[in-house]
Curated annotation (Swiss-Prot):
It is found in: Plastid, Chloroplast. The lineage of its organism: Eukaryota, Sar, Rhizaria, Cercozoa, Chlorarachniophyceae. CDD domains: RNA_pol_B_RPB2. It comes from Bigelowiella natans (Pedinomonas minutissima). One of its GO terms (molecular function) is ribonucleoside binding. In plastids the minimal PEP RNA polymerase catalytic core is composed of four subunits: alpha, beta, beta', and beta''. When a (nuclear-encoded) sigma factor is associated with the core the holoenzyme is formed, which can initiate transcription. This is DNA-directed RNA polymerase subunit beta. Gene3D superfamilies: 2.40.50.100, 3.90.1100.10, DNA-directed RNA polymerase, beta subunit, external 1 domain, DNA-directed RNA polymerase, subunit 2, domain 6, RNA polymerase alpha subunit dimerisation domain, RNA polymerase Rpb2, domain 2. Its EC number is 2.7.7.6. Its main location: plastid. InterPro entries: DNA-dir_RNA_pol_bsu_ext_1_sf, DNA-dir_RNA_pol_bsu_external_1, DNA-dir_RNA_pol_su2, DNA-dir_RNAP_su2_dom, DNA-dir_RNAP_su2_hyb_sf, RNA_pol_bsu_bac, RNA_pol_bsu_CS, RNA_pol_Rpb2_2.
Length: 1099
């Protein structure tokens, strides 16, 4: 039994579930912590009665007007001993997750990544041969370390505090020496040092130097008391220290401490004694150390929990703020004066704006968006540091199977620290990642019992076998002896001892990795590159489904919810590019009880047009008495004629500047089923994810143009717009207004020709649909300036040139250099929101936003890639008559270097292109599940050869499968018309165009800023930097003998300060450029002089 995409869980289920838990229980839990008492005044809060008001703006309006999509949290509060009245106070504005599982803050879609950290509890490690230590990790509070060093001394360490003897610390807490020796049971090494000679608790406190940094500020009299209070506060006061429920459970399980209750969230003296006791057990080889990289010792915080912890910090800040207010205000006590939403609002704004886990949503394509929401990071507050993270943290652990994808991770510093959830991964109530298995009993898979989710801890106790072992159709395991996994090791066990089996061969993979066909034939490094590069694929103008897929393309398309779906069954009564109307029959209202609800009292809310697709109708909405209601006399006629309208936005922009064009996929009058997609948008085709194009590929070197991963392309791909992508650029201009002078929006601008103003409307703003080029006016603006008093000479000059004294300066918004395209959107925003009518334009207008859409053809320098990590840059675009062609005259679309396959070990690309060739001639598409070798030996190769053989027979093209060199064909040279000497591999491969476009990379520096330290030009396009001429570039110029060019590059174009200021004057006066001394040379001399070498240089 194979789990098909129909049985896959929703890929965004984890994020939705977490945020809903926060709204239902998290808010209530944090508000309960609000305890405000000051000067006999107490505020009573009712956390169970909190309410969330609906958002003021829709998601679309928030994006346009740069606002945050949030809802108001109100709560009833009563001030005891003042008035008995209950007042509703606005506590904060909570950012709300959209139906696409992202947040909108200040108009920008953002994603909160999940964080994986060490679970709270105690963990034992071995550092060296004779050094052991235990780390006690809390949810809130300092980490504590207890260690035994080489000299058998037991120490206790806290960050930024000197270490103290651990047993002395216990004596300071009140445990006597005799009790310690009894409780520990095992012989204490180096007793004299560890226990000391203290007669009382006071002496132990005096000796401890745990808080030595406070000694200067504390009097000698209060030192004992202060030490005792500080120790208590550090680990035993709930205000400063919290183990959390999970931490307490873990410690109790570790020490078999049944007596300690779960509610006790701080450390006790008994915990310290048991911790030292267990450490001695490890010292004497009775117990084993913990594996901190095991997933049973890590827990995951998803968006809801991260926001909840931040909300809790805001509650503490609010508590402090209100207490200060209560202490200061004596008269006119009013809750609105005491309470403010600012403390919590600023805390949440900090989290969404500054926290590294809150990131701009990656919207290059739907796969990038989905993967970004399923990301799992070890970085951030409470996580690891990327600079100090060791190889063990980054490496693959056996417990990752089915929980975290071992392949998909970034290249570079974040490798192994940022991962993705596996397809079937779930999070339980304790924050542990679980993965599903089928139960096996006596060698038979119990499909009828459903699936069992196991955490890493539960998995250790069971014998588990992979999905791809041999089994019968009804679920009996074939072999008597099977290789099973138990406690992270493989052992051969009897089939009757097998407890669980995986549910799918895709179980260990992430979303992006599972889209790569034949990925099991590739090197893991190349699969990693393929997974990452699919997320960089630009949406194309003409989309096309892949001929060879894996079956998950449809699942991704439906789970993202970017596409408009129909909620009811019905037929399309009206269809246009802007609006779709669906008429349907409301079957659910046929059972309506007319006796208890007379028809005269039934009212229906007037239909309002909405911009969003998640429009839900229920009985409560229909039967609401409101001002905007319409009385219905015939209920059944209303039921039959109900209509739902969708308003479609044709062009959708993204954070990365890509653009999708929404297309209609249905016809007027067509009957549609519930959840049927109505439009095809970003990177989608036939309800599937479509990122690239199927091209005829040939693995042949061509005149050196495809040397080192360079790619040769057919010109027809440019002419036919095969790889043309749409990009949207946003322009914004603010209308400056002040008391003295304000900018004026107008069409009447002097010295501007009619051709430059023809696309402006009567107000001076560009019309939608206009085609604009570089330096064209988008918004005509004039700024009044003071009239200058002209001198007699200037007056005479103005009269001769017939020029008038200007009263205005032209401040119009223009199209930047080298940009052109079509205007798709113009929006007018005033101080208090969006302007709805064009008659209001000149009143209170604050900002104008304009979207410019441009089509970018593929060109030399663009980066393209396959799905197997086979990437390259286009080096040559050949005419169709110059490309090699097949036996039936079809020219190849793309030429790849054959040397790129054996060294990279990504054979999957060859298998894909050969199967794609048979797809083209058989007019079929194939879905190939990764790890298909489970169905038999060499299944992939046999399947491809059999399909090539079928296509050979069906089409009569005997050259498709040659008996002597199967998979290769003879192709013809376009210049001579003769076949090449050797047969080559040709096929159909799915090729992607990546966002690394040459148009955005090419940059030239004329003048720009210099670094203050080195006095050399800065680097980078954004800083208008220069191109670094390094050591090897200098050698190249030396090889050509270009002495003067090299001299100029290393001096006046670099850090010769005095000479570079005189270069322009020398060129204009036709003088010889004089070279001075460079700053680099001066630094070298200073370095040598600092070594006491008397080196001087003379002019």
């Amino acid at each position: 039994m194979y789990i098909t995409p129909l049985f896959f869980p929703n890929l965004l289920k984890l994020q939705r579930k977490s945020f809903l838990t926060f709204l239902k229980y998290g808010i209530k839990k944090e508000i309960k912590k609000l305890d405000i008492t000051k000067n006999k005044k107490k505020l009573l809060v009712y956390p169970n009665l909190f309410q969330l008001n609906l958002p003021t703006y829709t998601c679309n309006e928030c994006v346009i007007t740069s606002k945050t999509y949030n809802c108001e949290l109100v709560i009833p509060i009563r001030l005891i001993s003042y008035k008995d009245e209950i007042e509703w106070i606005t506590l904060t504005n909570i950012p709300i997750m959209t139906n696409k599982c992202n947040f909108i803050t200040n108009g920008s879609p953002r994603v909160i990544m999940s964080q994986i950290t060490r679970a709270p509890g105690i963990y034992y490690h071995k550092e060296n041969e004779n050094t052991y230590y235990a780390d006690i990790i809390a949810e809130r509070g300092n980490w504590l370390r207890i260690e035994i060093d080489k000299k058998n001394n037991i120490w206790m360490k806290v960050k930024k505090v000197p270490k103290v003897p651990a047993l002395m610390f216990l004596q300071a807490l009140g445990v006597t020496k005799s009790n310690l020796i009894k409780l520990l049971k095992y012989p204490i090494p180096n007793q004299n040092h560890n226990l000391g000679n203290f007669k009382s608790q006071k002496e132990a406190l005096e000796k401890i130097e745990l808080y030595s940094q406070l000694e200067s500020s504390i009097n000698s009299r209060n030192l004992k008391n202060q030490n005792k209070i500080t120790i208590f506060d550090r680990f035993m006061n709930p205000k400063y220290y919290d183990l959390g429920t999970r931490g307490r459970i873990q410690i109790n399980k570790k020490f078999n401490n049944i007596e300690e209750t779960i509610q006790h969230s701080t450390l006790t003296s008994k915990d310290f004694i048991l911790a030292v006791h267990f450490l001695l057990k490890i010292k004497y080889k009775i117990e084993e150390t913990d594996d901190i990289d095991n997933l049973k010792n890590k827990r995951v915080k998803i968006a809801g929990e991260l926001i909840q912890s931040q909300f809790g910090i805001g509650i503490l800040r609010l508590q402090k703020y209100v207490k200060d207010k209560l202490g200061n205000i004596k008269n006119n006590l009013h809750l609105t004066n005491i309470f403010s939403s600012t403390p919590i609002n600023t805390t949440l704004a900090e989290f969404f704006g500054v926290n590294p886990l809150s990131q701009f949503m990656d919207e290059v394509n739907p796969l990038a968006t989905l993967t970004h929401k399923r990301r799992l990071s070890s970085l951030g507050i409470g996580g690891v540091n990327r600079d100090t993270a060791t190889l063990t943290i980054r490496s693959i652990h056996p417990t990752l199977y089915g929980r975290i994808c071992p392949i998909e991770t970034p290249e570079g510093k974040n490798a192994g620290l940022v991962n993705s959830f596996a397809l079937f991964a779930e999070i339980n109530s304790e924050g542990l990642i679980e993965t599903p298995f089928f139960r096996v009993c006596n060698g038979r898979i119990l499909y009828e019992m459903g699936i069992n989710y196991l955490s890493a801890n539960q998995e250790d106790k069971s014998n588990i076998v992979p999905f791809d072992i041999k089994k019968s159709r009804i679920g009996f395991l074939s072999k008597n002896k099977i290789a099973a996994r138990i406690k992270q090791q493989f052992k051969e066990v009897s089939k009757k001892k097998v407890d669980f089996i995986s549910i799918s061969q895709l179980q260990m993979l992430s979303v992006a990795t599972s889209l790569i066909p034949f990925m099991e034939h590739n090197d893991a490094n190349r699969v990693l590159m393929g997974s990452n590069m699919q997320r960089q694929a630009v949406p194309l103008l003409k989309t096309e489904c892949c001929l060879v897929g894996t079956g998950l393309e449809t699942k991704i398309f439906f789970d993202l919810q970017d596409n408009v779906k129909s909620p009811p069954n019905g037929f399309i009564s009206y269809l246009s590019l802007k609006k779709i109307t669906i008429s349907n029959i409301r079957n659910e209202h046929k059972s309506f009880n007319f006796k208890s609800n007379p028809l005269e009292t039934i009212t229906c809310i007037k239909s309002k047009s909405r911009n969003f697709n998640r429009l839900k109708y229920n009985l409560k909405d229909l039967l609401t008495n409101s001002k905007e209601s319409l009385k219905i006399t015939n209920y059944m006629s209303y039921v039959r004629e109900q209509k739902i309208q969708y308003y479609i936005k044709q062009y959708n922009s993204s954070n990365q500047g890509t653009c999708s064009v929404n297309r209609l996929t249905l016809n007027e009058g067509q009957f549609i089923i519930k959840k049927n997609p109505l439009i095809s948008g970003l990177s989608s085709c036939r309800n599937e994810l479509a990122l690239g194009k199927n091209l005829f590929v040939g693995y042949i070197s061509w005149k050196g143009y495809n040397f080192e991963d360079a790619i040769v392309l057919n010109e027809q791909l440019v002419i036919n717009n095969i790889y043309t992508s749409t990009h949207l650029e946003k322009f914004e201009t603010e209308i400056k207004k002040n008391k003295e002078n304000s900018e004026i929006i107008t069409r009447d601008i002097k010295n501007i020709s009619f051709l430059n103003k023809k696309n402006l409307d009567k107000n001076g703003i560009i019309k939608i649909g206009s085609r604009v080029f570089s330096d064209d006016i988008l918004v005509g603006k004039l700024l009044p300036i003071e009239t200058r008093i002209l001198s007699p000479y200037r007056k005479l000059l103005y009269e001769i040139l017939q020029k008038q004294n200007d009263h205005y300066r032209n401040t119009s918004l223009r199209v930047p250099k080298y940009k052109r395209g079509r205007i798709t959107f113009v929006d007018y925003i005033k101080d208090k929101g969006k302007i709805k009518k064009k008659t209001e334009i000149l009143k209170d207008l604050k900002t104008i936003k304009i979207h410019l859409m441009q089509n970018r053809l593929i060109q030399i320098g663009d980066k393209i890639s396959g799905r197997h990590g086979n990437k390259g840059v286009i080096s040559k675009i050949l005419k169709i008559q110059e490309m090699p062609y097949l036996n039936d005259g079809i020219p190849l679309d793309i030429l790849l270097n054959p040397l790129g396959v054996p060294s990279r070990m990504n054979i999957g690309q060859v298998l894909e292109c050969l199967l794609g060739l048979s797809c083209f001639y058989l007019q079929r598409r194939f879905k190939v599940i990764p790890f298909d070798e489970s169905f038999g030996f060499e299944v992939s190769r046999n399947f491809i050869y059999s399909n090539l053989y079928f296509s050979n027979i069906k089409t009569g093209n005997n050259w498709l499968l040659h008996p002597y060199y199967p998979g290769k064909n003879r192709i013809f040279d376009s210049y001579s018309g003769l076949p090449f000497d050797q047969p080559i591999t040709i096929g159909k491969a799915y090729i992607l165009k990546l966002i690394h476009l040459v148009e955005e990379k090419v940059h030239a520096r004329s003048t720009g800023s210099y670094s203050l330290v080195t006095q050399q030009p800065l680097k980078g396009k954004s800083k208008k930097g220069g191109q670094r001429v390094g050591e090897m570039e200098v050698w190249a110029l030396e090889g050509y003998g270009a002495a003067y060019t090299l001299h100029e590059i290393l001096t006046v174009k670099s850090d010769d300060i005095k000479s570079r200021q005189k270069v322009l004057t020398s060129i204009l006066n036709s003088e010889t450029i004089k070279f001075g001394t460079t700053e680099t040379f001066k630094v070298l001399i200073r370095e040598l002089q600092s070594l006491c070498l008397n080196i001087q240089f003379f002019k």
